Amino acid sequence: CTILWHVDDLKISLVDETVLEKIARKLDKKYGTKDAPLTVNRGSVHEYLGMTIDYTTKGAVQFRMTDFIDGLLEEAAEDMRGTANSPAYHHLFKVNPNAKRLDEKKADYFHHMTAKLLYLCKRTRADIMTAVAFLTTRVSAPDEDDYKKLARCIKYLRATKDLTLTLEFNDSGTLEWWVDAAFAVHKDMKSHTGAVLTMGKGGVFAISRKQKINTTSSTTAELVGVSDALPLVIWTRKFLEAQGFKVTDNIVYQDNQSAMLLEQNGKRSSGKNTRHLDIRYFYCTDQINGDEKTMSVHYCPTGEMLGDFMTKPLQGSQFKKFRALILNIKPDQPATSPKSDRPEECVETRTV
């Protein structure tokens, strides 16, 4: 039995429906009252934490947050009207030192909207995650240039508000992580880590974040990127195995072969340009070569590297190609996607 628990909102799933009913009755007996019984929803379509989760299609689950996006767009300022083909300009990471700082009211609005975008991208819209990752680094002192980048992301959402995330799992038992890093792209010359997890079709999880330390080469940036993702790489395998899922391989794909050698061989492949690295970044060597062998590292050409989507503001056909793979949609799919024709099945609803 799997229970997702967020404050007082629970999502429970199990093959045996009788056990689900038993759990619901016990929870109602423990926490429900005559005047305020628990609310129970059953069926193929559920509303949970602002998401619509649709299990209508066999072998797939679709996530959408159209209502959340509609509310966000209603809050958009007048100068954020219009649409855009991508969530970020190609110069996303460039900071203009001469740009005027936003006044307090506008800065608060910038922070508010960025927080909403962060909530959205971490649940269903990973296609805006790179843009949002940069915006979150600017909330403490945003300027007019940052505001324009926020507006660009809002305009893209307006053009694509009905896009959904659909996950389809295969039976290979293979977890595939696509990990990449963009070297020294931030104002302080720090690099940017990107990662995507797939278990069939669609991105189950994604990372796009500024690295916490400076590195001296693209190789060391890639190594730090893997270190950033490694806790999740290991935890995901252990979590799935605890759920009874047989994991046959836990693959980390990279496009930097020098970094791969360091990860596979540890200090034996370390030259004068990498000796300064803390030993913790070779923890992955133990995961690859140790007794448990919790992961393996494979090469992936840059043109096929999904993690690249999370490290830089891609444009045009490459952006659409990776977006389609991560959201599991067609590359030429229109921005307005039809919702499920099947109405929500709700066997029982009790209001608090």
Where do the PLM segments sit?
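C-terminal reverse transcriptase regions that engage the nucleic-acid substrate
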Residues: 42-162, 301, 311
